[in-house]
Structure formats: structure tokens, C-alpha cells
Amino acid sequence: MGQKERSTADTLPDLEEWKSAAGLRWWQTAVVDGSGSGNEVIEGPQNARVLKGSQARFNCTVSQGWKLIMWALSDMVVLSVRPMEPIITNDRFTSQRYDQGGNFTSEMIIHNVEPSDSGNIRCSLQNSRLHGSAYLTVQVMGELFIPSVNLVVAENEPCEVTCLPSHWTRLPDISWELGLLVSHSSYYFVPEPSDLQSAVSILALTPQSNGTLTCVATWKSLKARKSATVNLTVIRCPQDTGGGINIPGVLSSLPSLGFSLPTWGKVGLGLAGTMLLTPTCTLTIRCCCCRRRCCGCNCCCRCCFCCRRKRGFRIQFQKKSEKEKTNKETETESGNENSGYNSDEQKTTDTASLPPKSCESSDPEQRNSSCGPPHQRADQRPPRPASHPQASFNLASPEKVSNTTVV
């Protein structure tokens, strides 16, 4: 009994040695191909990040004595390489071979990669459990958009220009290239909260000349670059032109706005503008700068047709009123005389009331004293209205008084 136990204890170290030897033999079998020759994967492929539409390259280095190298994409064999020639099943997957220091290097090239090609890349030997693997990432460059292709701004006036990168696999670095003179410029980047693959870059500047603005999106790791350019036109603010139209300024700004006129068209347009402005300015000066007003309206009496008509009607009405007034006075004086009035007495009265025509004295002083100031005639007084009653008196002869009728 004790001897049996002793023999069991003595055999335990032999069991451990057997396990170690079995593990070593299993590892050696793993790196041996079907023909029994030993080989291994010395260096497997490396991770790669490429752009959509470009090429992806992977290298796998194995020891001498290999029989078959298999390349798999997402656990699907896409390329097989034999010592003499590759076995190509898809034209998008090709192979290159190199000998380096007694080892063999196989290179797999994936042409025109697509986002669906992203996944695990594996290089393995036939009947071998050891392999090398890597991961392929395909990046997609999205759109780069500036809302306006041609911008027109005022000189020395601040403005903002936006650039929109959208549908990128990951957001790029945004920068601006200025092809014009500016007094100030700055930009900032604002990601879109609702879309992690989109963002907005805003450029604030104060332009001083015409030029271009370029929004640049880059992936430094891939050395990829995409840009969008916009033309910026600066318009000089006119000085004080009195509210007129600056025809030369308008013509000079047409090419920058995308319009082009021949020489004869520019000359004709300038002449047409001048011919249009000349009568406009003339009418403005005559009608707006005249200080005289008439008829209670706010227009010039010399150039307004309606005021001319009203003025003519007023003059005709005034002449007609004066004529009627004179006729009424004449009729009133003739109708107010008494029928018993003697014409001889009237003649005597008229003769007696006349002033002397000349001075008969030869002495100048006496002549001057006798020649007093001329008598004012009674008919030089301003006429009275025809509506008031009138009375005529004969003051020539105090002895004879004519009867007078008061109307």
C-alpha cells in the first residue's frame, strides 16, 4: 500500500513534464503548413485610414517555406497568393511581392475603396492558426458650401461669410485664405448640435478691396484638402452727390456684378441718363425753388398751368368789375341831378370855380406870392363806393342855390 502511494508520488513530476512537452509540440504544429515544413507570420499588416475612392495597401511578412498566403476582408477571403503567382478573384484586389533578408513580403492593394470596405483585414498561412490582422477605415469627404458665390459689400463696412461643411465622416479642420486687403478678420467654428457630421465656420472681416475668400477643410492625417471660393466685390460709398444718380459709378460696378456692356452701350446709356436728368433738374429748379405762390396752392405761379389759368381768370374778373363799377358811377351821377337845374348857372359856376391860368404881375416876388399852390380838384379824391347815397352841391354862386335830391 505504501509502495503504491510512493510510486504515484514519484510519477507526478513526469506528468508535468509531459504537459509542457505536449504544449510545445502543439505550438510547433500550429506554425507548420500542410506539407509539414515550419513557417510563421513574422509581421502582420498595420491599421489604415484612407479616403473613399483611393487605394488601401497592407503588407504581410512570412518566413521562408510557405506554400499559400490568404488575405481576408471581414472574414472573407478576397485574395490568395502562391509562390509562383497570385490567385485573383476580384480586380479590386491585387498583390505585389518583395523579398527582404530571406523573408517574403506580400502586399495586398485594394483599389477604389468604398465605405463598405471598412473592417478587419487578416493575413494567414494555409493550415495555420497564427495570423496577422489590422483594421481598415474608409473616410468620406463631404460637401463644403458657401451660400453666395458673389458677394457685394460696402467699403470699410464689417460683414460675415459662412462656410458649411456637411456629411463628413469626421469633422475637418476649417481655415480661411484671404485674397484681398482687410482691416480686420477673424473666424470661429460652431458644430451643429443635431448633426455631429456638420458644422458652420463664420468669417468676420472688414474688406478694403476686391478679391477672393477661400474656405479650406483639411484632414492632416490623410493629407486631404477640400476648398470652396467666393468672389467679394467692394463698392465705394459715393460722396455727397446731392441725391443724384452716379452714372459712371453704376457703369463701373456692372462688370463686378457679372454684367458686361459694349463701349457703345455704355456711351448710349450715359447719354440717355444725362438727357433724362436735364429736364428733371430744370423742372425741379423752376417748380421747387420759386418763392412766389399763387391761388393758395404749393406750386410756382410761373410754371404751373393751373395757376396760369386761375391768374388769367382773376385778371379778367378784376377788369370786368372795374368796368361795371365805372358804369354804375356814371349812371348814378346822371340820375341824381334835379330836373329844375339850370344849365346856365352850371356854366357860370364852372367858370367862377376855375383857378387863374397865369400871373400878370411883372414883379417876380409879387408874381410868386400871387401864384399860390394850385387848387386841388375835388374829383381827385378816391371814389366812394357806389352803394352809398351821393349828393351834388353848387357852390359857385351864393345867390342861386339849386334844389338837390338825395337818393
Swiss-Prot record:
Keyword Repeat applies: yes
SUPFAM superfamilies hit by this protein: Immunoglobulin
Superkingdom of origin organism: Eukaryota
Record's subunit section: Interacts with MAGI1 at tight junctions, forms a tripartite complex with NPHS1. Interacts with LNX1 isoform 2 via its PDZ 2 domain, it may also interact with other isoforms containing this domain.
Residue ranges of the region described as Disordered: 320-407
Glycosylation sites: 59, 103, 210, 231
Note: A protein of the expected size has been detected by antibody binding and Western blot in at least one of the analyzed tissues or cells.
GO cellular component, one term: bicellular tight junction
Topological domains annotated Extracellular: 1-266
Name by which UniProt lists this protein: Immunoglobulin superfamily member 5
Natural source organism: Homo sapiens
Gene from which the chain derives: IGSF5
Domain Ig-like V-type: 39-139, 142-231
Keywords, in A-Z order: Cell junction, Cell membrane, Disulfide bond, Glycoprotein, Immunoglobulin domain, Membrane, Repeat, Tight junction, Transmembrane, Transmembrane helix
